[in-house]
Swiss-Prot record:
Organism: Gallus gallus (Chicken)
Name of the top EC class for this enzyme: hydrolase
SMART domains: DUSP
EC number: 3.4.19.12
Protein role: Recognizes and hydrolyzes the peptide bond at the C-terminal Gly of ubiquitin. Involved in the processing of poly-ubiquitin precursors as well as that of ubiquitinated proteins.
Database matches in InterPro entries: DUSP-like_sf (IPR035927), Papain-like_cys_pep_sf (IPR038765), Pept_C19_DUSP (IPR006615), Peptidase_C19 (IPR050164), Peptidase_C19_UCH (IPR001394), Ubiquitin-like_dom (IPR000626), Ubiquitin-like_domsf (IPR029071), Ubl_USP48 (IPR044743)
Name assigned to this protein: Ubiquitin carboxyl-terminal hydrolase 48
One Pfam family linked to the record: UCH
GO-annotated biological processes: protein deubiquitination; proteolysis; regulation of protein stability
Chemical reaction(s) catalysed: Thiol-dependent hydrolysis of ester, thioester, amide, peptide and isopeptide bonds formed by the C-terminal Gly of ubiquitin (a 76-residue protein attached to proteins as an intracellular targeting signal)
Taxonomy of the source species: Eukaryota, Metazoa, Chordata, Craniata, Vertebrata
Entry-linked CDD domains: Peptidase_C19L, Ubl_USP48
Similarity comment text for this entry: Belongs to the peptidase C19 family.
Length: 1033
């Protein structure tokens, strides 16, 4: 199919030969492209928007041919949630509870512990009793929760189960990751305490039998040799891994002898005095299950937070503990049964998984929340986990492991089981628990059946829709000579899109002002058969229907008229162009603006297009909606502001303008052609006189310019040093030749200099207003000291001789004078007084207001300058960063053309006459002066931050972290040589004001850059398991 623009031209080509009054139904159908050939499938890469008969590429390809049944629904196969044969059951991660899931799976595979828990009886139900069917079972104690969880893990049909009841009973925060080793200790203590109330000794003592061992702290006095023992129980051995490579090295260090000397000497009861001694740990007995905690998470003294040690530790599958025991004649060979892994390089984030051996088959499994993976063969495989946790390329390479040994930098707990030749236990689920499991299995089966039925119904509906769409699409094209309807292409596409159910048909957006189909909307419409249209309107409703009667003859006739006028315009443009080449003699021509001549064709086209748009608005509606009054008024205003033909030579008084460069004479023939298109254009014969009022104003303007130039020259000559800012007096070093100096506003001096530089552009300065420097009581707002320092930029000092000239040239409202009085006999000492005198009350109020403004600000800019190691940080380094040549900057600004000046420096009032500063505007004026004089110029390695006075230093450090990638605990901040250390203090209380420059010195970055992700969590106080059931709350 031809491109869209070609189809547009072809649809209206008949207008070249057919006048508007001769338009027939055949022409109307041509305009609406009814007769275009429909496209065949395979001939179009995409739908032809210019052809309403093209029904290819509208989404039909999805429905033609065979369709996969899964596309008719978005329901996953419920059997994917079913437990596979001989597979273990996973546990849902509730947010950050993966550390809990790993321990639950490990304890579940401790068959002795599982059996003891099954035998545990509760207050409500003795072991062996059934639960009433009409009552939902809700575990009350920790033991009951574990019983129910273990029973589900053993016999559930689900692929994974939800441990939220157990987690909720402990009161754990599911969104906060906790210390897994601490959780293990606290839960074992809680479980032991809970089981101690059981009558059955096998249940009551199961924790001690499985996990409890004994060791003794043995202290030997070096003086008398007396040996003292302190026997203690342990449930795990906490082994330091720093500086070690093998597990046996860690155990050796744990049992290493320690010397007690100096201040740490031991008080010997035999010697009755402090003596040097040795202390060590002796292992007395070991449990059946030996838990070895590898201390991967340690406290970092430099940062004040925990960090993870990514040290590789080697360990074997068989561990002989006999060399470490006090008594050597026992059985102390242990087999590896579980390895608990922490993925990640930070102590505050990451993911926990567990590798646990099945005690019945000897096979290894990886437990990762809902997902459980069986290892190939019967060997433990840790290599993949170590690769996943690779923090950086700089880490130590993984050492080679021999047969039966492993090494890991992510293992934080190793569990060994005492080697035995006895067969493993066969643990059966008690009847009352099995009944609960069966109930849950029944619910799961019901859910699976519901999901399967929903899938089946969705597939059935999809197949019906498939056949329906195939049939309707075959009958969708309208055959030649048959009744037809136009329908929205967008609606058709939504009908073919299964993801969005179609809404009622809405054709209102395609209507013209006459309530029929707009010819320009044909590109978003499609012509379909009446049969399919009837089906659509019956099923989905909507409207209005757009059949053959909806083709708008009025719109087609009007478009025909406008197109013919545009064609005529092209011919007239050529004629006028040739006529303009003819020289006009005498007074037979007409004045036409040059700008109008350049754009008359475009203006005529726009005029024709406006007529086309007016036709759409003719009945007060556009696409069925009445236009907004505000929109109509806005359009009228825009039309008034637009240039109309020949108005570019009309002066403000409605007469011919005086500038002959903006107009030219055209012949009568050319003007007649132009007048056809612009009948209301102003007409000026070539003998027409220019506007007399404009001539008078022109002469007056020239006279004013000459007067202003003369004034500027006179004032510059009289006050030459003031204009050039040369030989100016200074209060800090009072000139010897005079005892009086006068003060004027610096604002006055700047405005006056602008006028002198550009007298034809700027208004003359006729008055000198000093009221801005005085308070409402008429007193001076500045002290002598302040005028030599911070307030010096607000005033200008004037010599007495200059003051005399100023009084002659300008109207002065207030005289401000400073007088020096020398003491008799002491020419070096002098007193300074001002007229008018200082107003202490208002001066104090001004200072308070200034300080308050500096301490109370929002969204102000400060600058952070990062200092590298090789640059010395001086106490006064911060002020140096603010140094900028403000005077040179101002001079450059003055020399710029108007409109290009920096608004921070340009204080002129847009060329208007200077207005006096009132007292109320004094403060804002002063702020402008301060801003101009202390304008900050950013330097390399510096970034601007938006801050408020009430935010804390800690919050500022977080902003700095995002800007410079420096963690808060690595930031050293200084301002004016003072270290900022109180994280809870506000910026206002620390003396940080707008435009301050803070120096940032970063400590050496930690090797683990991923820890940056945990800065927010690091900065929060660590509460551990406070408030949970593990601590008895």
């Amino acid at each position: 199919m031809a491109p869209r623009l070609q189809l547009e031209k072809a649809a209206w080509r008949w207008t070249e030969t057919v006048p508007p009054e001769a338009v027939t139904q055949e022409h109307i159908e041509a305009a609406y492209r009814v007769g275009l050939e429909p496209c065949q499938r395979g001939t179009c890469r995409r739908n032809c928007r210019g052809n309403p008969n093209c029904l290819v590429g509208i989404g039909e390809h999805v429905w033609l041919g065979e369709i996969d049944e899964n596309s008719f629904h978005n329901i996953d196969d419920p059997n994917c949630e079913r437990r596979k044969k001989n597979a273990f059951v996973g546990l849902t991660n509730l947010g950050a509870t993966c550390y809990v899931n790993t321990f639950l799976q490990m304890w579940f595979l401790n068959l002795e512990l599982r059996q003891a828990l099954y035998l545990c009886s509760s207050n409500e139900h003795a072991a062996g009793e059934s639960i009433p069917k009409d009552k939902d079972y809700e575990p009350q104690t920790i033991c009951e929760h574990l019983q129910y969880l273990f029973a589900l893990l053993q016999n559930s049909k689900r692929r994974y189960i939800d441990p939220s009841g157990f987690v909720k009973a402990l009161g754990l925060d599911t969104g906060q990751q906790q210390d897994a080793q601490e959780f293990s200790k606290l839960f074992m203590s809680l479980l032991e305490d809970t089981l101690s109330k059981q009558k059955n000794p096998d249940v009551r003592n199961i924790v001690q039998k499985q996990f409890c061992g004994e060791y003794a702290y043995v202290t030997v006095c070096n003086q008398c040799g007396r040996e003292s023992k302190l026997v203690s129980k342990f449930y795990e051995l906490e082994l330091n891994i720093q500086g070690h490579k093998q597990l046996t090295d860690c155990i050796t260090e744990f049992l290493k002898e320690e010397k007690l000397e100096g201040d740490n000497r031991y008080f010997c009861e035999t010697c009755q005095s402090k003596q040097n001694a040795t202390r060590k740990i002796r292992l007395l007995s070991l449990p059946c299950t030996l838990n070895l905690q590898l201390m991967r998470f340690v406290f970092d003294r430099q940062t004040g937070h925990k960090k993870k040690l990514n040290t590789y530790i080697g360990f074997s599958e068989l561990l002989d503990m006999e060399p470490f025991m006090e008594q050597k004649n026992g059985v102390y060979v242990y087999e590896l049964s579980a390895v608990l892994i922490h993925r990640g390089v930070s102590a505050y984030s990451g993911h926990y998984i567990a590798h646990v051996k099945d005690p019945q088959t000897g096979e290894w499994y990886k437990f990762n929340d809902e997902d459980i993976e069986k290892m190939e063969g019967k060997k433990l495989q840790l290599g993949i986990e170590e690769d996943l946790a690779e923090p950086s390329k700089s880490q130590t390479r993984k050492p080679k492991c021999g047969k039966g040994t492993h090494c890991s930098r992510n293992a934080y707990m190793l569990v060994y089981r005492l080697q035995t030749r006895e067969k493993s236990l066969t643990v059966e689920v008690p009847a009352f628990l099995q009944e609960l499991v069966e109930r849950d299995n029944c619910k799961f089966e019901e859910w699976c059946n519901e999901m399967a039925e929903m899938r089946k119904q969705s597939v059935a509906r999809g197949k019906i829709k498939h056949e329906e769409v195939k049939e309707l699409y075959q009958r969708l094209p309208a055959e030649a000579g048959s009744p037809y309807d136009f329908i929205s292409l967008e609606w058709l596409q939504k009908w073919l899109d299964e993801s969005t159910p179609p809404k009622p048909i809405d054709n209102t957006a395609c209507l013209c002002s006459h309530g029929k189909l707009h010819p320009d909307k044909i590109c978003i419409m499609k012509r379909i058969s009446e049969y399919v249209a009837d089906f659509f309107y019956r099923r989905y409703g909507g409207g209005p229907r757009l059949n053959v009667k909806a083709l708008c003859k009025d719109c087609v006739v009007e478009r025909c008229r406008i197109l013919r006028l545009k064609n005529q315009l092209n011919e007239d443009y050529k004629t006028v162009t040739n006529l303009l080449k003819i020289t006009v003699k005498g007074s037979e021509g007409f004045w036409v603006g040059k700008a109008s001549l350049r754009s008359w064709r475009q203006l005529a086209l726009e005029q024709l297009n406006e007529q086309d748009e007016d036709a759409e608005h003719s009945n007060g509606k556009l696409n069925g909606n009445a236009p907004n009054k505000d929109e109509v008024n806005e359009e009228k205003r825009e039309e008034e502001e637009e240039l109309n033909f020949n108005e570019d030579i009309v002066c403000p008084h409605g007469d011919l303008c005086i500038s002959e460069n903006e107009r030219r004479v055209v012949s009568k023939e050319a003007w007649k052609k132009l007048k056809q298109y612009f009948p209301k254009a102003p007409e000026f014969p070539s003998n027409k006189e220019c506007c007399s009022q404009c001539k008078i104003l022109e002469r007056e303007g020239e006279e004013n310019e000459a007067l202003h130039k003369m004034m500027a020259s006179e004032q510059k000559t009289s006050l030459q040093n003031l204009f050039h800012d040369k030989c100016r007096p200074c209060l800090g070093s009072w000139p010897q030749e005079t005892d009086e100096l006068y003060i004027v506003s610096q604002f006055f001096v700047e405005e006056w200099r602008k006028f002198v530089r550009r007298p034809t552009r700027c208004s003359p300065v006729s008055s000198l207003g000093n009221s801005a420097l005085l308070c409402p009581h008429g007193g001076l707002m500045f002290t002598y000291a302040s005028m030599t320092k911070e307030d010096s930029k607000l005033i200008a000092l004037i010599w007495p001789s200059e003051w005399e000239r100023i009084q002659k040239l300008f109207v002065v409202d207030h005289v401000i004078k400073i007088t020096r009085t020398r003491a008799a006999g002491e020419p070096e000492s002098a007193l300074y007084s001002s007229e008018p005198q200082l107003c202490p009350e208002c001066r104090g109020g001004l200072l308070c207001q200034q300080q308050r403004d500096l301490r109370e600000y929002t969204q102000a800019t400060i600058y952070i300058h990062k200092v590298v190691d090789n640059k010395k940080v001086m106490k006064d380094a911060a002020p140096e960063l603010n140094v900028s040549s403000s005077e040179a900057e101002e001079e450059r600004e003055e020399n710029k053309p108007e409109g290009e000046q920096d608004p921070d420096f340009n204080q002129s009032n847009g060329g208007a006459k200077r207005q006096k500063l009132s007292h109320q505007s004094y403060i804002s004026y002063q702020k402008q002066g301060i801003r101009r004089s202390t304008r900050h110029r950013k330097v390399r390695g510096e970034k601007a931050l938006l801050v408020s006075a009430n935010q804390t230093l800690k919050e500022l450090k977080i902003q700095i972290m995002h800007a410079f990638s420096v963690a808060p605990f690595d930031q050293n901040l200084l301002i004016d040589g003072k270290i900022l250390s109180d994280d809870t203090a506000t910026l206002g209380s620390l003396g940080i004001i707008p435009e301050s420059v803070i120096l940032l010195k970063a400590d050496e970055p930690i090797a683990d850059y991923a820890a940056m992700d945990d800065v927010m969590q690091v900065c929060m106080p660590e509460e551990g398991f406070k408030g949970t059931g593990l601590l008895g709350h």
